[in-house]
Amino acid sequence: MKTKTLLRYAISICAGLGISGMVHAQDWKVTGEFGWFGVGKAHEVEKGHFYWVGEFSGTFFNDKGEGSLFHRAGVKCPAWFDADFNNKKSKAGGYCIITDLGGDQAYLTWQNAGSPEAGGRGPGTFQYTGGTGKYKGIGGNGTFVGVTQVNWQDGTSTGYSTWNR
């Protein structure tokens, strides 16, 4: 009798933890905008085709505003960008480190493909890979659309990406 009671209790706890884990995973889904500035080195592979390696960095603004997940957090993304203007195709990928005002960090990997022209859109996906502090154990994935507004003559770029919109 005591064994059955303990077994039921253990099953209840496991079920409760499973449900709360699912709810918590949903909490990591942010909706907002990341304004970025890209600095790096562009190499012309062939006329009209560039391969860029560098970093996109800026600030994330959560649509829910003050007190919401990652709102006004710093974002730094070491990355690569393959821009083929001849065929009007681009692809990119890398990692991002998201740091909030308290210094806690979340890490993710991302990839996208699209158009390299100014205003060109590149839909993609990201996956959380880990974190520190309150983001320890972060998991899940999301979608984003990266938009390059300007490819500057000095090899830098400016743009933004919308997350989960």
Language-model regions, residue ranges each:
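Bacterial N-terminal signal peptides that target proteins for export
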Residues: 2-11
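Bacterial N-terminal signal peptides
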Residues: 10-20
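Beta-strand-enriched cores of mature, soluble protein domains
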Residues: 24-165
